Amino acid sequence: MNSINVKTLRWSALVLGLGAGMYEHRSHIQCQKQKEIDENYHRQESLIESAKIAYLNTKNTPPKEDSMLPNLKKDSEDFDMDEFVKELEKNV
């Protein structure tokens, strides 16, 4: 009678251990999948933010002045009044 109780106890412990191991394995896999999803989401967020910044930088860059254009700034030493008047006439 004693041996039947010991065998039953051993088999019960084995089944409980296998069940606990399967539960732990499933929760570990689920945690890994969720972590991978979160990392992918944060990576995409950072890519979107860097793309927004790059777009704003390209949109807000001032146009480069052409060196062939006459100097139309009144404060500079190379100011050309004739070119300035011609430019005003074109705009009017």
UniProtKB/Swiss-Prot annotation:
F-type ATPases have 2 components, CF(1) - the catalytic core - and CF(0) - the membrane proton channel. Keywords: ATP synthesis, CF(0), Hydrogen ion transport, Ion transport, Membrane, Mitochondrion, Mitochondrion inner membrane, Transport. One of its GO terms (molecular function) is proton transmembrane transporter activity. This is ATP synthase subunit e, mitochondrial. The lineage of its organism: Eukaryota, Fungi, Dikarya, Ascomycota, Taphrinomycotina. Mitochondrial membrane ATP synthase (F(1)F(0) ATP synthase or Complex V) produces ATP from ADP in the presence of a proton gradient across the membrane which is generated by electron transport complexes of the respiratory chain. F-type ATPases consist of two structural domains, F(1) - containing the extramembraneous catalytic core, and F(0) - containing the membrane proton channel, linked together by a central stalk and a peripheral stalk. During catalysis, ATP synthesis in the catalytic domain of F(1) is coupled via a rotary mechanism of the central stalk subunits to proton translocation. It is found in: Mitochondrion inner membrane. One of its GO terms (cellular component) is proton-transporting ATP synthase complex. Belongs to the ATPase e subunit family.
